């Protein structure tokens, strides 16, 4: 008699989106585009919040009322992550995450995460890791203490074989140099192979 194996599909991360709106951009197009990006990252979008950039808050990018609205929604509808359709500073990432108590991804980190999911070659995986490290390095001073909300299961600094996100400046800088050297080595090898084929 054959054994029956029940295959459980891993649930997609439940996310909410916040879109800062520019008067010159089409709101529906912006909503559709960021939703497609989230879908590509394996996310399940629960709700989209938006606010005019006129209400820009340097600390959290959104007004206090909007932040409270999202916080109240999350109390009733727990989600794994907030995706902000904007490039955030390290302090903004940390401030929003501290206010909401969940992981926060900005647009850049979301796109890097999609590349991580689709990277198949050795070079592709190295390039993803390099992009992640450079992203972290520019935001390092503000992200200290937020490590737990970047690593782990699901989207956000997802990478080949990574279980812990390194937030040490010297180690990051050293790894960036190593990764750049590895990429250059791969490119040189490819050039040499092409020259040999052409002979």
Predicted regions and their residues:
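N-terminal accessory targeting/assembly segments
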Residues: 1-107, 111
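Conserved G1/Walker A P-loop phosphate-binding module
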Residues: 7-15, 143, 147-199
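Short hinge/gating elements
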Residues: 18-22, 55-59, 112-119, 154-169
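Short secondary-structure transition/capping segments
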Residues: 20-23, 88-101, 128-136, 153-161, ...
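Alpha-helical initiation/capping and key positions within long helical/coiled-coil segments
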Residues: 26, 125, 129-132, 164, ...
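Short alpha-helix plus adjacent loop in nuclease-associated cores
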Residues: 109-131
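A charged, well-structured terminal subsegment
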Residues: 130, 134-148
């Amino acid at each position: 008699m054959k054994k029956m194996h029940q295959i459980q599909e891993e649930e997609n991360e439940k996310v909410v989106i916040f879109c800062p709106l520019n008067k010159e951009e089409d709101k529906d197009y912006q909503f559709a585009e960021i939703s497609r990006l989230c879908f590509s990252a394996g996310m399940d979008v629960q709700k989209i919040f938006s606010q005019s950039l006129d209400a820009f808050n340097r600390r959290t990018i959104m007004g206090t009322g909007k932040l409270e609205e999202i916080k109240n929604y999350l109390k009733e509808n727990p989600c794994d992550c907030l995706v902000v359709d904007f490039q955030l500073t390290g302090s903004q990432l940390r401030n929003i995450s501290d206010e909401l108590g969940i992981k926060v991804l900005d647009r850049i980190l979301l796109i890097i995460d999609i590349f991580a999911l689709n990277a198949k070659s050795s070079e592709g995986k190295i390039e993803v890791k390099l992009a992640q490290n450079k992203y972290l390095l520019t935001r390092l001073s503000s992200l200290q203490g937020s490590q737990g909300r970047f690593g782990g299961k699901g989207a956000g600094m997802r990478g080949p074989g990574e279980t812990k996100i390194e937030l040490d400046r010297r180690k990051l800088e050293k790894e960036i140099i190593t990764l750049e050297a590895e990429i250059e080595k791969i490119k040189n090898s490819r050039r040499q192979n092409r020259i040999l084929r052409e002979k």
